[in-house]
């Protein structure tokens, strides 16, 4: 998927990537709400320099969260959106299972940017974890 997005940006620019990216990041209910945050997210993606996006995409292509997750000794909290198409909640559950002592919270309804869709619940979850 990353190679296709990189090629798309090279051919069409970041503005053309904004709508499909935000579509993938957010839950259907959030889209249906017509929140002004959707326009803010599209503007953010559009304003991202193509070279920055491509560099991040290349970095994410080879990222393997599971390979060394057991080496983490710090407390960890996994927050997943129930409707996250970018990093599905099941993937987060696997990481949680692989990291002893970690905590897992699924926010619903929420997509990849659960902090934008459920800001109060997300913030309270984080505050509670941090103590």
PLM feature segments, named:
Residues 19-20, 38-67:
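Hydrophobic, aromatic-rich cap/lid helix
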Residues 21, 57-60, 95, 122, ...:
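Hydrophobic "lid"/C-terminal helical patch
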Residues 3, 35-39, 89-93:
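Short, surface-exposed alpha-helical segments at coil->helix boundaries
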Residues 9, 45, 84-87, 111-117:
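Glycosyltransferase donor-binding loop in the core domain
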């Amino acid at each position: 998927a990353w190679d296709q997005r990189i090629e798309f940006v090279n051919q069409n620019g970041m503005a053309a990537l904004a709508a499909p990216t935000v579509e993938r990041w957010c839950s259907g209910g959030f889209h249906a709400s017509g929140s002004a945050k959707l326009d803010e997210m599209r503007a953010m993606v559009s304003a991202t320099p193509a070279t920055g996006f491509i560099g991040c995409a290349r970095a994410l292509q080879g990222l393997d969260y599971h390979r060394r997750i057991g080496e983490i000794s710090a407390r960890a909290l996994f927050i997943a959106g129930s409707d996250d198409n970018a990093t599905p909640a099941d993937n987060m559950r696997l990481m949680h299972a692989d990291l002893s002592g970690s905590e897992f919270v699924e926010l619903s309804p929420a997509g990849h940017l659960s902090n934008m869709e459920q800001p109060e619940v997300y913030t309270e979850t984080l505050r509670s974890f941090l103590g």
